[in-house]
Design a protein with these regions (language model features):
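Nucleotide-activated donor-binding/catalytic signature segment of Leloir-type glycosyltransferases, i.e.
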Residues: 53-89
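A conserved mid-protein helix/loop that constitutes part of the nucleotide-sugar donor-binding site
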Residues: 32-47
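Short acidic alpha-helix that forms the nucleotide-activated donor recognition element
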Residues: 84-95, 118
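Conserved donor-binding/catalytic core segment of Leloir-type glycosyltransferases
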Residues: 17-35
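A charged, aromatic-enriched C-terminal amphipathic alpha-helix characteristic of glycosyltransferases
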Residues: 148-198
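Acidic donor-binding loop of glycosyltransferase active sites
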Residues: 92-107
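Donor nucleotide-sugar binding/catalytic pocket of nucleotide-sugar-dependent glycosyltransferases
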Residues: 1-11
Length: 201
C-alpha cells in the first residue's frame, strides 16, 4: 500500500475563476519557501512569450514579497488568497495546467499531486533536489513535465516548458481509466480492502 489519496474526479473545463481565452496555469496551496521555493519556476515562466497564458498562484506564502515582485513585473502572474477545499478542487478542475513546487525534503511527499493527477490534467513539477519525493509518482503519470531545478539548465528548462505548454497534452478516456490501475495502491479503496482483510482474519 501507499498514500491513499488518488480519487478520480469529474473534470469541468467551464471556468468562473479564470479567463477562458487564456491558457491557465495553476498552483494552489501553501508555499513555505524554506521547503518549496517557487522562484526558479517564476523565472522560467517570465521567459515564455505571449499574452494568451496566465499563471495563477492561490494560497499563502511565507515570502509574499517574492511573489508580488514577480506579479508586478509580469502582469500575466496573478496572486490570490487561500480558498476552501471545495473551491480549490473546482479551480483545479478548471485549470489547463497544474503546477507543483517540489519539496527540498526527501521525506515530504506533497499530497496535492494525487489530487492533481485525479483530474487527468497536465502537471508541471519543479524538483529542487534529485530525490524530490513527488517525482517517483509523477514519472509514472503520462502528462507530466518534471523540471530538474537542481541541474540548473535554465535555457533547456525554458524550452521544455515552452514545448509542453504549446502541445497542451490531454488524456482520452481509456488513458484516464488506466490511471485507476496505475495508482490503485494509492486509492482509498485499496487501503480499506486491506484493513477489512486484517479485521476479518
Amino acid at each position: 500500500l501507499d498514500l491513499p489519496l488518488f480519487i478520480p474526479r469529474i473534470v469541468n473545463n467551464d471556468s468562473n475563476f479564470f479567463n477562458n481565452d487564456k491558457i491557465n496555469l495553476l498552483y494552489i496551496g501553501t508555499i513555505p519557501v524554506h521547503i518549496r521555493n517557487p522562484e526558479y519556476f517564476l523565472k522560467l515562466f517570465c521567459e515564455l512569450s505571449g499574452d494568451d497564458i496566465a499563471l495563477n498562484i492561490i494560497g499563502s506564502c511565507t515570502a509574499p514579497d517574492l511573489l508580488y515582485s514577480f506579479s508586478e513585473s509580469d502582469k500575466r502572474i496573478h496572486i490570490g488568497k487561500s480558498v476552501n477545499h471545495k473551491t480549490a478542487l473546482s479551480m483545479i478542475s478548471s485549470a489547463d495546467f497544474l503546477i507543483n513546487f517540489g519539496n527540498n525534503n526527501t521525506h515530504m511527499t506533497p499530497c496535492k499531486i494525487f489530487e492533481y493527477m485525479s483530474y487527468g490534467k497536465p502537471i508541471i513539477s519543479v524538483s529542487p533536489i534529485k530525490d524530490e519525493p513527488s517525482s517517483r509518482y509523477l514519472e509514472k503519470y503520462p502528462l507530466s513535465l518534471i523540471i530538474k531545478e537542481y541541474e540548473n539548465n535554465v535555457a533547456d528548462d525554458i524550452e521544455k516548458l515552452k514545448n509542453f505548454v504549446s502541445q497542451a497534452p490531454k488524456l482520452d478516456q481509456s488513458e484516464f481509466d488506466k490511471l485507476n490501475e496505475l495508482f490503485y495502491l494509492n486509492k482509498p479503496e485499496a487501503f480499506i480492502k486491506v484493513i477489512k482483510k486484517e479485521v476479518l482474519q
